[in-house]
Amino acid sequence: MQQYLDLMKHILAEGVDKSDRTGTGTRSVFGYQMRFDLSKGFPLVTTKKCHMRSIIHELLWFLKGDTNIAYLRDNKVSIWDEWADENGDLGPVYGAQWRSWPTQSGDAIDQIAQVIAQIKSQPDSRRLIVSAWNVGELDKMALAPCHAFFQFYVADGKLSCQLYQRSCDVFLGLPFNIASYALLTMMVAQQCDLALGDFVWTGGDTHLYSNHMEQTALQLSREPRPLPTMTILRKPASIFDYQFEDFELTNYDPHPHIKAPVAV
């Protein structure tokens, strides 16, 4: 994951200091892209230990269409705790938009089911897109979508995915985002009987928080290690039937975890 370290270096060298919604302050660049060949290892950062269990459970939670953190809490995942209300609700965040985007007629669109059907029937379509950025419901969300929309692309029997992330916390959030969408691409590829292509990450406001600078320096002092392997142990009937136990991460030998505060 040298690409990830190169992004950090780029922000430190070329970024500008900006204020932000949280009041923390950031060093930021606008517009950056990384590409990961998913056939050459699973893109999970190795210069610090990442909590893959949380990444998997969060993705399964999105795919359930769930927007209450009870499932996450039951599985000891706390990454959404700061934004939930007293009942554990987050409003119509990712899961709601992915699985039940509301229409003017009162119906709802299951974007995940729809895009998989489209990949199977129209693999050359340029409309293989899922969006979480529902302008009409942003004010109801506890946090506006950071990873706003993603697009699939089929070529030579391989499935690729590109994510546009409008706002990116590079130290804490980005390793999760890359791994989550890489895993989602693997799952969709399996469901559509396609080989793995690339995961392309595109960032908008791409930043390091001012209170993550010491942690960033520590991470930059470490040498990346070989990427691990992610294996999906079975092919369930649909994208919605995967269980946590279906995923096996092997050969992950990261440097120690680096703790950092979350900007809320």
Swiss-Prot record:
Keywords from the named record: Cytoplasm, Methyltransferase, Nucleotide biosynthesis, Transferase
Binding positions (dUMP): R21, R126, R127, R166, S167, C168, D169, N177, H207, L208, Y209
GO MF entry, a single one: thymidylate synthase activity
Catalytic site positions: C146
Keyword rRNA-binding: no
Gene3D superfamilies the record matches: Thymidylate synthase/dCMP hydroxymethylase domain (3.30.572.10)
EC number from the UniProt entry: 2.1.1.45
A GO BP entry: dTTP biosynthetic process
Pfam family, one: Thymidylat_synt
Record: residues binding (6R)-5,10-methylene-5,6,7,8-tetrahydrofolate: H51, D169, A263
Location within or outside the cell: Cytoplasm
Pathway stated in the Swiss-Prot or TrEMBL entry: Pyrimidine metabolism; dTTP biosynthesis
One GO cellular component term: cytosol
SUPFAM superfamilies (alphabetical): Thymidylate synthase/dCMP hydroxymethylase
Reactions catalysed according to its record: dUMP + (6R)-5,10-methylene-5,6,7,8-tetrahydrofolate = 7,8-dihydrofolate + dTMP
Alphabetized InterPro entries for the sequence: Thymidate_synth/dCMP_Mease, Thymidate_synth/dCMP_Mease_dom, Thymidate_synth/dCMP_Mease_sf, Thymidylate_synthase, Thymidylate_synthase_AS
Disulphide bridges, residue numbers: none
HAMAP family: Thymidy_synth_bact
Role summary: Catalyzes the reductive methylation of 2'-deoxyuridine-5'-monophosphate (dUMP) to 2'-deoxythymidine-5'-monophosphate (dTMP) while utilizing 5,10-methylenetetrahydrofolate (mTHF) as the methyl donor and reductant in the reaction, yielding dihydrofolate (DHF) as a by-product. This enzymatic reaction provides an intracellular de novo source of dTMP, an essential precursor for DNA biosynthesis.
Subunit field text: Homodimer.
Cited PANTHER family: THYMIDYLATE SYNTHASE, THYMIDYLATE SYNTHASE 1
Family: Belongs to the thymidylate synthase family. Bacterial-type ThyA subfamily.
Protein name (database record): Thymidylate synthase
Organism: Shewanella sp. (strain MR-4)
